[in-house]
Amino acid sequence: MDSLQRLNGLLTLVLSALWHLGLTASNYNCDDPLASFFSPMTFSSSLDLTGSYSSAQLNWKMGTGGWSPVDSNAQQWLQIDLGNRVEITAVATQGRYGSSDWVTSYRLMFSDTGHNWQHYTQEDSIWTFVGNMNADSVVHHRLLHSMRARFVRFVPLEWNPNGKIGMRVEAYGCSYRSDVADFDGRSTLLYRFNQKTMSTLKDVISLKFKSMQGDGVLFHGEGQRGDHVTLELQKGRLALYLNLDDSKARLSSTVPLVIMGSLLDDQHWHSVLLERVGKQANFTVDMNTQHFQTKGETDALDIDYELSFGGIPVPSKPGTFVKKNFHGCMENLYYNGVNIIDLAKRRKHQIYSGNVTFSCSEPQIVPITFVNSRSSYLMLPGTPQIDGLSVSFQFRTWNEDGLLLSTELSEGSGTLLLILEGGTLRLLIKKVAGHGTEIKTGSGLNDGLWHSVSINARRNRVTLTLDNDAASPAPETSRKQIYSGKSYYFGGCPDNLTDSQCLNPIKAFQGCMRLIFIDNQPKDLISVQQGSLGNFSDLHIDLCSIKDRCLPNYCEHGGHCAQTWTTFYCNCSDTGYTGATCHDSIYEQSCEVYRHKGHTAGFFYVDSDGSGPLGPLQVYCNITEDKIWMTVQHNNTELTRVQGSSPEKPYSMTLNYGGSMEQLEALIDGSEYCEQELKYHCRRSRLLNTLDGTPFTWWIGRSNERHPYWEGSVPGVQQCGCGLEESCLDNAYFCNCDADMDEWSNNTGLFSLKDHLPVTHVIITDTNRSNSEAAWRIGPLRCNGDRHFWNAVSFSTEASYLHFPTFHAEFSADISFFFKTTALSGVFLENLGIKDFLRLEMSSPSEVTFTIDVGNGPVELLVQSPYPLNDNQWHYIRAERNVKETSLQVDNLPLSLREASEEAYFRLHLTSQLFVGGTSSRQKGFLGCMRSLHLNGQNTDLIERAKLMSGVTPGCPGHCSSYSSNCHNGGKCVEKQSGYSCDCTNSPNEGPFCQKEISALFDPGTSVTYMFQEPYLVIKNTSLLSSPIYTDTARSKETIMLNFLTAQAPTILLYLNFSSQKFLAILLSSNGSLQIRFRLSKGESHVYTMSTENLANGRVHQVKISKDGPEISIQMDQQLFSYNFSTKVEFWTLKSLVLGKVTETLGLDPEVAKVNILGFLGCLSSVQYNHIAPLKAALRHAGVAPVTVHGTLTESGCDSTLDSDVNAVTTVHSSLEPIGKRDEQEPLTNTVQSDSAVIGGIIAVVTFVTFCVIGIMICFLYQHKQSHRTNQTKEKEYPETLSNSFRNVIDLQNTASECKREYFI
């Protein structure tokens, strides 16, 4: 019922708005010529005219044939006085008859009084009209919004470069009737009701107003039960208070329900319309409408006794008001169809008025605008050498800094400066020598409001007054008399003056000033305009052209708008968006995109519609090798027990997923598959078994509908899954729980119909009987698959295209997609309007252009690529246009950007269909593939549209040609229908990109042995089964890789056992340097020592050994060593590969055997020999791989540092260090010779003491150990930190520790 009432209210408001629009449009006869019937004095101009005033009429051919000023410059204007306020709906222009003088563009201004002019605006910008191309043709413009004014000005902007300014003009419209009331700031109009209370379900209040002040109450009404409605000006903005039947919400304690408008104290007319139907309301200020819902408990507004306009009088206290009264004029004031001002004029008994008059008295205030921050200034003369000075004026600005006033004082008194610095007013009197005087006052004065300033100096004291609040007077420190100067410079300084005449330590002022007084005398600024008083540069006289660039607010997604005089900025902090207008999301649109950018599992924010209106939502992305699961948690994932519920008193739980339903729907709709698990445990608690078919328990999904199907069943069938399969505990029922047994049973299963997910409510009504109880759990929402990221099509002909509805993006437009092609050029997409258009194309094999026209001329952006874009690889394009800038991005190439004009924000008006892959002319179409097309964040389903069009095929194969490089460490790219995956079979790593290291902790007694007698069955690539490592033939190329971390030296890392007692061992010597010891042919063993750097330092190090024929290269971290065998050496058939301690010691090289006694204590990761990953086989495929594990092997990540206690224990120096014959070809540049005898002696002493301490510690620990430890392989563990885990491994060493103890003794 509430939704129906809300819909009713919205429909009524829409119809009401259309009715008001119809009233405006119904005046279709308002197009009569207005200027032709007036006397010649109707026309006037800025300065000289070549002929009489009457010659400016349209089609005038006599005399000079029109208006043409002597000087053609930007200060000229032609003005028409239409006698009274009229409604102007159109204008027309011609050039001067029989001449080469015409205007090619112009602006319109209008005024009620001939002063305080106002620009005609359209689309929130000062509108420029297209003028004439010759002297005789008439160019007619119908105004989008009519003007109501007495005076109209035509202001030429550009004219024929081969002639001068010349115009003949006409204005079209009709008479305008209005009822006006003038409020002096102390008066009100009261509309008394015939009954005590006026109760209304619908209200329409409309009026127009012009205000002299920034604050004041326009209307107010209230009731005894808390109802109230108030419209109030607050600092130049309209604040609306509206409350229905809520006694707690009093006007004095509430905040405005809606705030709209800005700069409404500009003494121009502004329109207001308030429409309410029940709790639904529309509030419109100057054609900008905001819809809102009122506060309160009922739909009726109950107002007692009266409505007041212009103020809130206090009952029984005449002349007393609750808030500041309105000072200004109101026009055409209507309350629910009643013309309030007309009743007051006719002195009807319902109206009680204070000091209200019925004509608008407007003071002749002339404002001026300082336009340029470098060259604007106003010079006004003063009376020099007066004892003291007095200057006052009002200003308004958006800039924090600017010069307000500079004047050179007489008699060596110095220079007086008044500047705005950081929004604070600062008065300085600077002396030629010595210190001056300084006064500061105010803050935030760049708020766009009018502020009054007064400076008074007498004798040696100076007073600065801001907004009638005087700052502390400052004495002039020199005690010297202050004398006034002869010239006062406002806003800036001319370029030709010295610093003593006009000093400006800051940039010129940009803003408005008015009511300038010097020596208590007002200055006539019209005389300044006419050249008879003072001097000026870059000023607009008789208008204040301040504009609120934050209204409307172009900062999207909650971005905060800040502005200066010329532009605005968006602060996007904490919004989740970035860019000039906070348009671009900083988050990706799905877990698939995070995977594509190299991320692994974790919590991420997902913004399903990108730059669209939906905000980001936190999800968990479980990115694995086969599927990518997106999980959204809710507020009740634990098992919940329920008792005492009945149909009369049901149990209900609402699930909160941390986001709106629209966000969740977008996530689900963008996924291929979604599910939620339900576990319902029951004891004498039924689900569906009722006599009338009404379920006892149900759940509610996304569309707010009840769903009584459970556990694997299907919609529309009121059963559980076991009922469909006929497998319930009691086949007489369709659910296990419906058997109503005293024992616990359950119905558990998955909901997977996307149109019904997510589960939002659970309702249970059958747990109020004896021993009746239920327990339920709804799992998180889980989805996989991305319907958008791999949504691709192929265009096969230049004439083929896809068409979509018109792209609506008036102020913000972003387009992104991937493409690949072999063609030389082609149009990606195009959308046309009457004048506007946008086009995105590959103009050459290395260039992409984005062309857009929003009505002010085409803008073309170009990105040139240093590599060809037609290489049949996927490339990414993103084009964006907003009111601040236009940009084009291709791949990761430099961004092409063009800033927009600050003077106008044009809407993009497109009318045709959007053509993708081609153009409306079916020429220059794109040949190739496109995918993942997004328009303003919304996905465009290319595949579905391609099914309806010829020449376009759904899908596009060949992803691995672009993305195979994403598969690392030997991983292989595998094509999929939608995208690709990485096969990590031949990689020592795992994960979606084969980047996740597989690593394990080793005890001194741990041994991992991989046997090579036969290939193991885990290998997925059958071609590897014939690898030479399984045969008796030798390989010419071999590769060994491993990462290690240890604090033990000496130690053994890896051992390769070949036939005929040949071997290769990777060791750390006693000083921690890396050694490669091998015997690959008959003869003695050889050893390569890579470096004397201590690698047993608790950090991860990487070793890679590559053999190619007689050459062998060894890379250790960032160092590379190269060697050549002196004789032919081959890697013969391997028998086994051992990590850690070698268990088969028969025939073991004596030197290796000595190190092998200690085993390996530390961490190994990413171990690989050719295509074999022995550590991965031991941890992932131990049941089928030919691998044997002895001792404790614990899976854990290798950390980069170890606990300090570990480092203190494990560096062991042994006198039994294996020594062998050094290869003669080992490079001397990468080795360090033996230490001196003195250093060796010191080390020996330190080593002996260390051995003793370690031996005592090990004996103490050994007494607390088990007497026997069986060989085992631990299952996968994830310790919180490696340091703690590693320390425990060392502290709890097994029997190998005993061996080490005996070895040291």
From Swiss-Prot:
Span of domain F5/8 type C: 25-174
Subcellular location, record wording: Membrane
Signal peptide residues on this chain, from the entry's feature table: 1-24
Topology in membrane: Single-pass type I membrane protein
Main location: membrane
Glycosylation sites: N282, N496, N571, N622, N1057
Similarity section: Belongs to the neurexin family.
Protein name: Contactin-associated protein like 5-1
This protein's encoding gene: Cntnap5a
